[in-house]
Amino acid sequence: LSDYRTRHSQYKLDTMLQNLHQQYPFYTVWDDHEFANNSWRDGAENHDPSRQGDWNSRKSAALQAYLEWIPIREIDVDNKFKIYRSVKVGDLAEIFFLDTRIIERELETDTDGPNKRLIGEVQMDWLQQGLKNSTAKWKVIAQQVMMGPLLIFGITANQDQWDGYKIERKRLFDFINNND
């Protein structure tokens, strides 16, 4: 916990960031580095349980420091890890903030597996219902990773984004295309 707190306190020493916070409001969603590099629901690329302890304890410590240093409204009192939410900007836009890192994300193996999840069923259902029921002119999806394919010489270049979860991405894109 102290390491995460120290990291956040160091970021806040940046005078340009201080000026930015003074002038503008923020809507935030964490990325993997708030926990550990290339993290997912049950672990992280650079998490070593023998040196760093239990992954769930580490996630909880990272979350606590995040919430101490980056104030956001509590979304679910029973699940502090639930950060996905939507924000309306009048009748012009509704921004849907996703969690593509911690809640349901599985390790990106077997990219074509039919049950692979980046955001999971609960968040997918929430997003689809929100998009369908929104009366805003613009519906914006804000999240941490690239949605569009990144191919180099026809080969998927980065599994650490929606490319690693092709079936779930297709399901979302199909929904958007069919509910325009």
Where are these regions (language model features)?
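Metal-dependent phosphoester/phosphodiester hydrolase catalytic core
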Residues: 1-180
